[in-house]
Every structure is written in structure tokens, then in C-alpha cells.
A protein has these predicted regions:
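Acidic, low-complexity mobile loops and tails
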Residues: 1-56, 101-109, 118-122, 130, ...
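Conserved hydrophobic positions within beta-strands
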Residues: 16-18, 63, 72, 80
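Short, conserved beta-turn/loop elements at beta-strand boundaries and strand-helix junctions
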Residues: 21-24, 83-89, 114
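Short hydrophobic beta/alpha edge segments that flank linear recognition/processing sites
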Residues: 54-72, 92-95, 102-108
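Short beta-strands and strand-coil junctions in structured, solvent-facing domains, enriched
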Residues: 69, 113-115
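Polar, enzyme-active/binding microenvironments
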Residues: 126
């Protein structure tokens, strides 16, 4: 898998969720390639229902993968306004194309300016991603 991290995206550093700002309040979410590589092949993906409220740091769904089963943690608070039906039906799309066909959902963020303060973006992405890849390699989570 290509472990690239586009600098125009925002990254939640602990749970490896990426955020794409589509408008002031509409934010597209997905799992970054490092998070996916450490999980292994996704077999099952479930997201909270449309229009449900999600809270930063709380579950917004569940995933089952080759190396782990667990909750998908929300990087922001808001309301789910769109879900990627294709990825829900075929979770392997998340593995194959995490920034494209494998996106997860779009949320309407309550307060992007405040909510995004903990996210990594721009020039900070390169240093963070290199450090994370080294940490994952040292743990044996990726090759």
C-alpha cells in the first residue's frame, strides 16, 4: 500500500482518520493508509445512521479487519449527513483507495475552527507521518 499523506488534508493523529474540508461545515472523513495498513484487510464496516450525532473521541462506527476488531473513533463532533454506501457494502474499497472510493462519511461539523485544533495538516504532516511510520515499523505493525 502507498503510505502517502497529502498535506491538504487534516489528520487525527491517534486514530488515523483523515478529514477533507468540503465547505465551512461539511467534512469528509476516511481512514489514512497507515491506519489501514496496521488493521489489515477490512472485512466489515458499519457506521452510525444518517443524521446521528457523533462526538469527538467517541464511536462513530465499528470495523472488523484481519488484525483488529473495534470501534471507529470520531475525530470531530457533528452530524453524519452522508455515508459511503459502496464502502459499507464492500469494505475492501477502504483498503484499496482510502482517499478516493474508500472514504467513510461526510459530517456537518458543529465548530470546525475549534474542533480542528488537534488535527495535523500542512507542513507538519510530513514529520508526523514519518515518525508514525517508524513507530509502526518498530512495533511490527507494518513492514
Amino acid at each position: 500500500m502507498d503510505l502517502t499523506f497529502p498535506k491538504h488534508l487534516y489528520y487525527e493523529p491517534e486514530h488515523h482518520v483523515w478529514c477533507l474540508v468540503e465547505s465551512d461545515q461539511k467534512i469528509r472523513l476516511g481512514i489514512d493508509p497507515l491506519g489501514i495498513s496496521s488493521l489489515g484487510e477490512l472485512a466489515y464496516l458499519s457506521l452510525n445512521p444518517l443524521e446521528s450525532q457523533i462526538r469527538k473521541g467517541q464511536a462513530m462506527g465499528v470495523l472488523e479487519a484481519a488484525k483488529m476488531t473495534g470501534e471507529l473513533i470520531a475525530p470531530l463532533s457533528g452530524s453524519i449527513i452522508e455515508r459511503n454506501r459502496e464502502a459499507l457494502e464492500d469494505p475492501y474499497q477502504v483498503n484499496q483507495d482510502p482517499y478516493g472510493k474508500g472514504w467513510l462519511c461526510v459530517i456537518e461539523c458543529e465548530d470546525w475552527k475549534t474542533e480542528s485544533e488537534h488535527l495535523i495538516t500542512g507542513e507538519a504532516v510530513e514529520a508526523w507521518s514519518e515518525k508514525e511510520m517508524e513507530r509502526y515499523r518498530s512495533q511490527g505493525w507494518i513492514d
